[in-house]
C-alpha cells in the first residue's frame, strides 16, 4: 500500500491551495493508494480545511502521522509554483502551469453579477506597496470605478475611497461572490489563488519585490505597481525579514 502524507506548515488559504492538486496527481499518476493531510498542518481559517481538503475526493482525510512539507519560492524556468511543488513531492503528470483545485461548485448570486469588486485584504507580502493612493491612482488611470470594496478582515489591507462595503460569512459564499462578480481586483493574496481554483480570471495588483512564484496563474492579469515605500518603510521591511529568519515557517 503506497501512502503519501502531506504536511502544510504555512496556514493561509492560498498556501493550502498550492498543494490542492497533489492528491489527484498522486493517485492518477503517482501510483499512490492513499493520500492524507497531516493533522500537524496549520490552518488560519477552519473553512480552509473544509473547502480545500474535506471536499477533495482524492484525499483519504487526515492522519496524526507526520507528513512531508516542502516549499520554495525559487521556481525554475518553465514551471509555476504548483508544478514545482508537484515535482518536489516526486510526482509528475507531465503537464505544466497547473492551477489550484477545489471541488466546491460555486453558486451564481444575482446581486454580484454586474459588480466590479476590489478586495483590499492581504496577510503576507504583496510587494513594496502599502498606501491607498497607489491603488486609487491606478484605478483612476485605468478608468475603473469599483462598485464595492470587501470589508477589512482584521489583517493588513490597502483600502481605497469606496463607500460601498461588502462581505461574506465564510469561504464558500466568498467563492460564490468571486464566481458571480463582473470583475475582481485584489492584491497578491489567497483571493487570486482561490479565483484560479474556480477558473475565474481576476486582476492582481502587486508591488516591486514580489517573487514570481506568487504570480502563478495563467488565468490572471498581474499588474506591477512599482513601489511607494518610504525610507522608514524599507527599514521596517528589513527588520521584518530578519525576524522571519528566526520564526517557524508556519507562524509567518
Where are the regions that the model predicts?
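Catalytic machinery of carbohydrate-active enzymes
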Residues: 1-252
Amino acid at each position: 500500500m503506497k501512502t503519501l502524507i502531506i504536511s502544510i506548515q504555512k496556514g493561509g488559504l492560498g498556501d493550502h491551495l498550492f498543494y490542492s492538486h497533489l492528491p489527484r496527481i498522486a493517485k492518477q499518476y503517482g501510483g499512490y493508494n492513499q493520500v492524507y493531510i497531516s493533522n500537524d498542518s496549520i490552518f488560519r481559517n477552519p473553512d480552509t480545511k473544509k473547502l480545500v481538503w474535506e471536499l477533495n475526493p482524492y484525499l483519504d482525510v487526515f492522519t496524526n502521522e507526520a507528513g512531508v512539507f516542502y516549499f520554495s519560492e525559487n521556481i525554475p524556468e518553465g514551471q509555476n509554483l504548483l508544478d514545482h511543488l508537484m515535482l518536489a513531492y516526486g510526482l509528475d503528470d507531465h503537464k505544466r502551469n497547473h492551477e489550484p483545485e477545489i471541488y466546491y461548485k460555486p453558486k451564481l448570486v444575482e446581486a454580484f453579477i454586474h459588480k466590479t469588486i476590489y478586495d483590499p485584504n492581504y496577510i503576507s507580502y504583496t510587494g513594496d506597496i502599502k498606501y491607498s493612493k497607489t491603488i486609487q491612482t491606478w484605478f483612476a488611470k485605468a478608468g475603473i470605478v469599483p462598485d464595492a470594496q470587501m470589508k477589512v478582515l482584521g489583517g493588513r489591507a490597502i483600502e481605497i475611497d469606496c463607500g460601498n462595503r461588502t462581505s461574506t460569512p465564510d469561504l464558500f459564499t466568498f467563492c460564490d461572490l468571486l464566481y458571480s462578480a463582473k470583475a475582481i481586483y485584489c492584491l497578491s493574496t489567497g483571493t487570486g489563488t482561490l479565483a484560479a481554483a474556480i477558473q475565474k480570471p481576476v486582476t492582481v495588483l502587486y508591488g516591486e519585490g514580489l517573487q514570481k512564484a506568487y504570480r502563478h496563474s495563467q488565468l490572471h492579469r498581474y499588474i506591477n505597481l512599482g513601489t511607494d515605500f518610504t525610507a522608514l518603510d524599507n527599514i521596517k521591511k528589513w527588520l521584518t525579514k530578519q525576524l522571519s529568519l528566526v520564526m517557524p515557517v508556519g507562524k509567518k
